[in-house]
Amino acid sequence: MIDHVGISLPSLAEGTRFFGRTFELLGFSGEPYEGGGFVEWEDFAIGEASVDRQLTRHLHIGFYAPSREAVDAWWRDSTASGYESDGAPGPRPEYGPEYYGAFVLDEAGNSIEAVNNGPRRQPGVIDHLWLRTRSLEDATRFYEAVCPAVSHTVERHDGRTQIRGSGATFSIVEGPPTEGLHLAFEAPDLATVVAFHDAGVGAGFVSNGEPGERPIYHPGYYAAFLLDPDGNNIEAVFHDR
């Protein structure tokens, strides 16, 4: 399961307004967590881009909508607020017989979607992601190396690779590469965190933080980090609460 996804935007204030309104319209209750320069809604977090925090670009995120009416309301509200449409509400049968989605571009040009497509995939707000990469073969090799450790499967298709677990899915295609993305897999124990990191480093990929506790996030936050071939920060995390 995906534990969380983090992106960086030009303005934290505007991102908080836009995504806060998004999740209100999509029926998610509860206040976001704010701290450490981030705002987080369940499994999705935003921060402000800076010299030390790369702007997130060329990413697609689909958020779960409880109904087609919620998709419509979100798109109308977002476009009325000045966000550019990236696709009006409607069926998308190429993705599935019940698939109904709408799309806008966020302030960094990322494609944001509200989608109604059956039951929610996992607790949280994220339904799926699409990443772009310079080399589909290199990106696929990375995920083939690390995903078995975190109980995700990697499926090669014509022109794309899909990663599946027990919750949200993500797919990878070639194109202008996704940048500034942080994606964390949930780990059931510390041994899984270590296995994830060892698998990536053993396959020749770059460590971005060895396994260990990160109490800055919370006591018992055990994590390890790798860079994917496009430089995105990929994590496995065990919450020992």
Q: Where are the language model's segments positioned?
A:
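Vicinal oxygen chelate
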Residues: 2-11, 53-125, 127-135, 202-241, ...
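Core segments of cupin and vicinal oxygen chelate
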Residues: 6-45, 130-169
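Conserved active-site tyrosine of GNAT-family acetyltransferases
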Residues: 15-19, 78, 109, 139-143, ...
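Active-site beta-strand termini and strand-to-loop segments that position acidic
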Residues: 38-43, 104-107, 162-167, 175, ...
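A short, glycine/Asx- and small/polar-enriched loop/turn
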Residues: 40-45, 55, 97-99, 164-170, ...
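Short, charged/polar, Gly/Pro-enriched secondary-structure boundary elements
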Residues: 53-54, 110, 168-172, 232
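Structured core of small recognition/catalytic domains
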Residues: 130, 137-140, 149-214
